[in-house]
Amino acid sequence: VHCLKYGLTTNNLLGIEMVTMDGEILRLGGKHLDAGDYDLMGVMTGSEGLLGVVSEVTLRILQKPATQRALLVGFDDTGSAGKAVGDVIAAGIIPAGMEMMDGLAINAAEDFANAGYPRGAAALIIVELDGPEVEVDVLIEHVEAIMRAAGASSVKISKSEEERNLFWAGRKSAFPAVGRISPDYLCMDGTIPRRRLPD
């Protein structure tokens, strides 16, 4: 969820020690993110254990943001929601996390988690903003204005950490929730260029 702002796992690895399938111990990476060699750590991370067993990692540690708040934004159509995602990024705002769900996932997740999702919405976007409290307050105003300009039918802003977690609990339960409706459900990660989301 937070890879938009903070990167993927591989972006936060400084080094790994791993054991290859033939028993060789390899040390990859170092103490700096910008090592000039091939991205072997990226290859190993992407292989998810197929090329060896990782026995030690050196990670980049980030300080927890002072404030984290989320917006739960409903739309009457997925095209407007897709456009809103691009509009937020085009405005120079990089949310800590941003996820979009369609109507089927919204209702399945709401049945499963009671997260307070708008049942009549055709699409839902969860936007998380983090940083100093004053900055987050300003960003929330900007993001809400962008969402409304893109056609948002509802906007709910988390008032507490518990409510923010509840917004995300619904999203995180979407896969098992849809699985209850269709046990043979197949989930695949896809990549869509932001400019094509409205399509």
Where are these regions (language model features)?
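FAD-binding subdomain of flavoenzyme oxidoreductases
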Residues: 1-99
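C-terminal substrate-recognition/cap domain of FAD-linked oxidoreductases
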Residues: 59-63, 69-199
